[in-house]
Every structure is written in structure tokens, then in C-alpha cells.
């Protein structure tokens, strides 16, 4: 990187904040949170790579399933199964909305 130390630190902080937002999304999806909660988190993720979001959600739910049976985690994996390359962020929004309506 050609960035100075302060710039690298700022980039690192932004990446960590994004990762935390995606994990927050995962937690809300697993607990069966409301669409109101989810859309606030999604608004903060709108500029992020949709495929990165999808893969974190899949990994989070996979980790839950490998520990114990969890039908909700399996359902979330099913909703996030397809790659987002052709559709982008609207796919993430639709998947989250669909999950909130399958309580």
C-alpha cells in the first residue's frame, strides 16, 4: 500500500466497522428480528460488495449449523444460496425481506 500509517489505520477501522455491521445483520436474521431492524443495517451496507455480505452470512449460518441443529440458520442459507453477481445489492435486500416473512 502506498498509504501512510494514518490512512492504513483508517482503512482498517472502516473494514472492521463493515464486518461488524454484517455480523449484526446475521444476528438479527438468526434471532428473527423485524424488517425495521434489518433495513437500518442494510442501509449502512448499501455501498459494500453484495457477494461479500452473502458469503459472511453463509459462513455465519454454517458455523451455527455445525454446532447444532438450527432450522432458521438452514433457511437463511437457502435464501442466500445463489451468488449476487448478476443482481447485486437488491438480492441481499430481497433475501433479508423474504427471511423476515418466514417467521
Regions found by a protein language model. Name each.
Residues 1-103:
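AAA+ P-loop NTPase domains with strong preference for DNA replication initiators
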Amino acid at each position: 500500500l502506498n498509504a501512510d500509517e494514518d490512512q492504513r489505520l483508517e482503512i482498517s477501522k472502516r473494514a472492521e466497522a463493515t464486518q461488524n455491521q454484517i455480523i449484526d445483520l446475521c444476528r438479527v436474521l438468526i434471532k428473527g428480528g423485524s424488517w425495521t431492524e434489518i433495513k437500518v443495517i442494510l442501509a449502512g451496507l448499501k455501498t459494500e460488495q453484495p457477494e461479500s455480505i452473502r458469503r459472511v452470512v453463509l459462513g455465519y449460518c454454517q458455523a451455527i449449523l455445525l454446532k447444532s441443529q438450527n432450522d432458521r440458520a438452514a433457511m437463511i442459507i437457502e435464501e442466500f444460496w445463489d451468488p449476487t453477481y448478476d443482481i447485486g445489492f437488491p438480492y441481499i435486500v430481497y433475501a433479508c425481506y423474504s427471511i423476515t416473512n418466514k417467521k
